A protein has these predicted regions:
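A short, surface-exposed alpha-helical micro-motif characterized by mixed small hydrophobic
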Residues: 37-39
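Helix N-cap at the start of a conserved alpha-helix in ABC-type nucleotide-binding domains
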Residues: 5-7
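Helical segment within the ABC ATPase nucleotide-binding domain
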Residues: 9-23
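Conserved catalytic/dimer-interface elements of ABC ATPase nucleotide-binding domains
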Residues: 45
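ABC ATPase nucleotide-binding domains
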Residues: 70-89
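H-loop/switch region of ABC-family ATPase nucleotide-binding domains
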Residues: 31-32
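ABC ATPase "signature
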Residues: 55-56
């Protein structure tokens, strides 16, 4: 669902905090916004046209090259606080 920035960041902070608990329950997070890939998320799967486009460790997959190919347009990924941010070139 499309949360406003404040609500989104609150939800992501709760997920990040809960992931650090000793008895943390693994979770799958589905999003269209790469900036929502929090530090607790270690691996990603990118889907395109209903098929797996790429999967693996987030730092290996969320790159300028992979995302530019997937989105069919030039993009740049900037990492800030272990979170990726997408910039359209």
């Amino acid at each position: 669902s499309g949360l406003d920035v404040k609500s989104r960041e609150y939800l992501l902070s709760v997920l990040e905090k809960n992931s650090k608990n000793e008895n943390a329950i693994p979770f799958i997070y589905v999003t269209h916004q790469i900036e929502e890939v929090i530090p607790a998320i270690t691996h990603v799967t990118l889907l395109k046209d209903g098929k797996v486009f790429a999967k693996g460790r987030k730092k290996d997959i969320l790159t300028d090259e992979v995302l530019s190919e997937m989105f069919e347009m030039p993009v740049k990924v900037v990492w800030e606080n272990d979170r990726p941010w997408l910039i359209v070139k």
